[in-house]
Amino acid sequence: MAQEEKERFVIPDENGTEHLFDELFRFTVDETEKSYMVLVPVGEEEDDEEEVEVFAFRYEEQQNEDNDISFYPVETDEEWDMIEEMLNTFSEEEE
């Protein structure tokens, strides 16, 4: 299976400071038709002694000529549980 190229995203924080993120993975939940993306800050190198902080968002692709993506906060415990399960599966596959 060919590995698809991951995208980079610039996301501002609550103070307006922009941060650059690499896409770790994305997935869509069939039952809700909601899509989620897990991102890692650029420059965060993973090693055996230190865990990398990851960020998860619900996202929607805009139907415009630029195919922009809008990010939304994850709001429910059920969503977080599902994202955590997907992250664990992703981590196991990477080992």
Swiss-Prot record:
InterPro entries, alphabetized: UPF0473 (IPR009711)
Family statement: Belongs to the UPF0473 family.
The name under which this protein is listed is UPF0473 protein ABC1595
Give the organism, scientific name.
Answer: Shouchella clausii (strain KSM-K16) (Alkalihalobacillus clausii)
